[in-house]
């Protein structure tokens, strides 16, 4: 009797083991398929960004020229950054709105006109997606548009020259602004280092353990922004 019971138990264990192995194999297979599909979607979305980036840049340059401004070089989000953003937000690559992006730079007094011009031009071209005025408790403010194409959105930001200086390190902003304008802004802000706005933001965003540290850099960020153009929206 005990021998029969032992054989029965062994059979049950073997069957259960086979079932668990099968389930694990199915789970792994589904996970692999999902990962492969994500990489395919990523490839496709980044390919569409290459297609929709140039017309986005053309619109930005067209508007910038009408207002004696500048358009920054077209920029594409890296694959690594795109994948990280998707996994963090649990989103599809096609849901990201800034795989291709550029910025229109202008004098502070021209910002409203530039915003109106971008919206009008994009609407006429049939690619206007949305407009958003952004603010934060760190003193940062800015404006962005999303151009809506068939398979993907792209992004156009609008910044004053001073706020572009505040957001980007010298190796990025000096070539775009040119030496003359860069030096004017450098003098006007009292010789402050460019790009500290983004630098402080990255510290605040990455430090999730210390409220005191985040508050310290938040105050630094607010003080830094006070040397540049104030938000034009009251």
Language-model regions: role of each:
Residues 86-234:
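Long beta-strand-rich cores associated with HINT superfamily self-processing modules
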Residues 24-26:
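Bacterial signal peptide processing site
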Residues 28-29, 157:
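Intrinsically disordered, low-complexity regions of eukaryotic proteins
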Residues 13-16:
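Repetitive helical segments and hydrophobic/amphipathic motifs
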Residues 19-22:
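C-terminal motif of bacterial Sec signal peptides marking the signal peptidase cleavage site
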Residues 29-86:
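Intrinsically disordered, low-complexity polar/charged tails and linkers
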Residues 1-10:
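Bacterial N-terminal signal peptides that target proteins for export
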Residues 4, 33-43, 47, 61, ...:
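Polar/charged alpha-helical tracts
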């Amino acid at each position: 009797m005990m021998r029969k019971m032992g054989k029965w138990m062994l059979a049950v264990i073997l069957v259960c083991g086979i079932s668990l192995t099968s389930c694990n194999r199915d789970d792994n297979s589904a996970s692999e398929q999902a990962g492969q599909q994500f990489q395919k979607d990523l490839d496709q979305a980044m390919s569409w960004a290459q297609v929709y980036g140039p017309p986005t840049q053309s619109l930005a340059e067209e508007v910038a020229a009408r207002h004696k401004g500048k358009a920054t070089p077209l920029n594409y989000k890296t694959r690594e950054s795109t994948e990280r953003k998707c996994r963090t937000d649990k989103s599809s690559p096609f849901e990201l709105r800034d795989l291709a992006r550029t910025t229109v730079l202008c004098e502070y007094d021209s910002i409203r006109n530039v915003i109106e011009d971008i919206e009008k031009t994009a609407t006429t071209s049939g690619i206007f997606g949305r407009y958003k005025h952004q603010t934060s408790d760190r003193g940062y403010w800015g404006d962005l548009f999303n151009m809506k194409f068939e398979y993907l959105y792209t992004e156009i930001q609008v910044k004053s020259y001073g706020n572009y200086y505040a957001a980007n390190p010298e190796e990025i902003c000096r070539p775009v602004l040119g030496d003359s304008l860069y030096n004017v802004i450098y003098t006007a802000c009292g010789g402050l280092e460019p790009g500290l706005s983004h630098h402080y933001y990255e510290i605040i965003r990455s430090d999730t353990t210390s409220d005191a540290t985040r508050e310290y850099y938040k105050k630094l960020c607010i003080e830094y922004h006070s040397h540049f153009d104030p938000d034009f929206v009251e």
